[in-house]
Amino acid sequence: MAASATTMLLKYPTTVCGIPNSSANNSTDPSNNIVQIPQTTTTNSPLLKFRTPNKPVNAVAAPAFPSVTTTTTTTPSSIQSLVKDFDPLVPAEDALTPPSSWYTEPAFYAHELDRIFYKGWQVAGYSDQVKEANQYFTGTLGNVEYLVCRDGEGKVHAFHNVCTHRASILACGSGKKSCFVCPYHGWVYGMNGSLTKASKATPEQSLNPDELGLVPLKVAVWGPFILISLDRSSREVGDVGSEWLGSCAEDVKAHAFDPNLQFINRSEFPIESNWKIFSDNYLDSSYHVPYAHKYYATELDFDTYQTDMVGNVTIQRVAGTSNNGFNRLGTQAFYAFAYPNFAVERYGPWMTTMHIVPLGPRKCKLVVDYYIEKSKLDDKDYIEKGIAINDNVQKEDVVLCESVQKGLETPAYRSGRYVMPIEKGIHHFHCWLHQVLK
């Protein structure tokens, strides 16, 4: 179990992905060393020069979703058999929880990536990360490496972060640059994904830049959130909030769309457990809190706890207390969990988001981003104490989740039972999973 330091940050941290690359350092821009591409070409040029990058790119169409390779021999029919091992029609009071294989089987995890994470909207990052032209950040979703950037015209783009020449990861971390230069063979892409230079290629090869641009992803900005979708069935972007959160969109918007909030810190927690274990833990209406989180329990008025489920969202509300002498939660805490793996929390002067990143059938990562009202920015002691309290809660949850994973791996356990009504949020989540996985 490990967690990042909680030193206060005033910008989103740089995270390195893929191969080592000096471009992860925001102070160094290798694109500054690229000669500007002229509008005309000569037949003896060692470079194949393409049109200017501000023109639209017609990149190669991406597959409906990337393939996922596993080492299991489980067949599609056996996967569906595992899905059917949970029956959503049985009343929660009598129902068995999903079998342990949902949390341990590599092929089931691959099926989840296919049916859940490669369909619909997934949070990729935050609009403040690309607030300025030429800013970018990278990330991973399953076996998909993605890149989000803002071009010189102010438009936000998302692409598969893979060079179309030899499949090298193109960019790492986050930062600001005028173009993307592949670290392998020096191919250059504009901020709109167009290929602008293929080093050492000759005009006689007839390489078509319109077929070699970065493969685009569907992208949308909704308030502070940037969302991506790998679903190629439609390139149209409609009402993103409603598509993502359904009828709960307005409730979440009322809490999250606040220009008075300032990002201050990110904490990351690697977890040796299936991603759903943390989701289950989050959705138990604080059933576990009095037993596992002694300090956090003193902050909640459990008699006021309310849990509501609509569509793919569970919203939990609870009144805060000042019994411990430090009022972190204010009068009421609001916790919205958007299935499958993202939470928006508002309490007191704080907003936190919690992103559960699946990394394998038995591994995930929790990313917690902290925001605070600007009037509190000068209160360093309050900020540091608030972050420390919440980080400690997450560390305690990591221990619980890893313990559950170990138990699920044993022959002693196959399925459990729900305690109702306090675990109705978990049951609702499991029914949603069954619906999208069948």
From Swiss-Prot:
Pathway recorded for this protein: Amine and polyamine biosynthesis; betaine biosynthesis via choline pathway; betaine aldehyde from choline (monooxygenase route): step 1/1
Function (record text): Catalyzes the first step of the osmoprotectant glycine betaine synthesis.
Keyword match Oxidoreductase: yes
Gene Ontology biological-process annotations: glycine betaine biosynthetic process from choline
Its EC number(s): 1.14.15.7
Catalytic activity: choline + 2 reduced [2Fe-2S]-[ferredoxin] + O2 + 2 H(+) = betaine aldehyde hydrate + 2 oxidized [2Fe-2S]-[ferredoxin] + H2O
InterPro entries: Rieske_2Fe-2S, Rieske_2Fe-2S_sf, Ring_hydroxy_dOase_asu_C_dom, Rng_hydr_dOase-A
Cofactor(s) in the UniProt record: [2Fe-2S] cluster; Fe cation; Mg(2+)
UniProt tissue specificity: Expressed in roots and leaves.
Keywords (A to Z) from UniProt: 2Fe-2S, Chloroplast, Iron, Iron-sulfur, Magnesium, Metal-binding, Monooxygenase, Oxidoreductase, Plastid, Stress response, Transit peptide
Entry protein name: Choline monooxygenase, chloroplastic
Rieske domain ranges (all copies): 121-228
Organism: Atriplex hortensis
Subcellular localization, as worded in the UniProt entry: Plastid, Chloroplast stroma
Cofactor note: Binds 1 [2Fe-2S] cluster.
Family recorded in the similarity comment: Belongs to the choline monooxygenase family.
